[in-house]
Amino acid sequence: MLGALQATEVIRFDEEDRRAIEGLGSHPVVRVLADALKFYFEFHQADGLGWCAYLHDPLVVANAVTGKFASTRPLAVDVELAGTLTRGQTVGDELGRWGKKPNVDLLCDVDARGFIEHLMATLRGGLG
């Protein structure tokens, strides 16, 4: 399963979400997550994107396990190894020109609020 930035960047944590996580208590996972969010909030603010953080990997994992937070579609992808601007970038054959079978399920139509609510409920229920 692949979560391209167009899909995963709809999981945008704002200040209210950050405070809600901090309010979950003093469990080490809460502290680590709160610190990570603060780092990314500051990073995105400095980069001109605002006081926010995006949670890419947790969305992809949660959807792979539950199938509840995004639809998927098959896509052939490969990693660009020769490009001077795109070296190391995952690229997809959106037009089917490569003649290769799809090798990933690409996330589409993400339920951002549903995922955030699921993540918060998981953290509340699993940190006891």
Residue ranges of predicted features:
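N-terminal acidic, glycine/proline-rich low-complexity segments
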Residues: 1-128
